[in-house]
Amino acid sequence: MKKYISIISSILVITSCDVVEGPYMSDTTNPPINSTTKKILIEDFTGHLCSNCPDAARELTAIKDIYQDQIIGMAIHVSTSFARPYSASQAPAFQYDFRTQWGDNWDDFYGVSEAGLPRGMVNRMGYPENHKLGKDEWASIVANVLNQEPDFELTISSTTDLITINSEILNSINGDYNLVVCLTEDNIINWQKDGANNVEDYEHNHVLRSVLIDEALSSSSSYISGQEIERLINYDLTALEQSNINYSENTAEAGNGNAGNWNSENMSIVSYIYNNITKEIMQVEEAHLNN
């Protein structure tokens, strides 16, 4: 999976570099967003043809209402059964393809949809046996994890073509860690099955759009408290959008190429650090994409 993502990223992401312990300042309109407390990523594996999936989305919203910015959500549309677009003969219903190559790769690796949707992962904890969680299991795990002391702090800032991620080590630690940078989009109005209803104007939020990088946080496995690692990522939103369209049209099963019409005004950057052995997400942060 990582090899495939790395190949795609090398085409669409112009540059990605890291500088250790450098006091840099990005020229950006957006103020940096940083995480000093433990934050949690809830990955909601879903599909617009999944009639029970809106209940999971509402559960995620309820958890976020309680814990506010400590909870970051990501809706990952997966599987031919639940996320394929309908044929053109059934237009206008369910014509959009929310799937991405990264979401499909994650689903293949973690096997979430094979357990039935809706289902999700909370910081990818419990892998490889107990990570595929029903929505009613999310809240209790969140409550247990939020009080943990974080080992990393993430700061995100962006311009129209550059994303800057600063990772600060809060506690000296050894391990094999990766840094991931994703783009998500809110307020996508489109079809969704919700119980017995086909809702034409359902609001889809924090939908995974793209993954810019998934690569080693550092060349070293030893991290020292106070150390900072800065990653600069140039991106081309138009090229990333076209990649999704091409994936839907040429690769995704039953795809139709209707995967564009991104609205950059509604997009966010989600970045996280995960343990490459256990797959557990150690820290996550989110910031609006400055466009």
Model-derived regions: residue spans:
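Short, conserved sequence motifs used for protein processing/export or organelle targeting and
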Residues: 75-291
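Residue-level signal for short, function-critical loop segments
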Residues: 2, 48, 187
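Bacterial Sec-dependent N-terminal signal peptides
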Residues: 1-4, 9-43, 51, 291
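Intrinsically disordered, low-complexity boundary segments flanking structured domains
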Residues: 27-29, 59-64, 139-144
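Local sequence-structure signature of Cys/Sec-based thiol-disulfide redox active-site neighborhoods
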Residues: 31-81
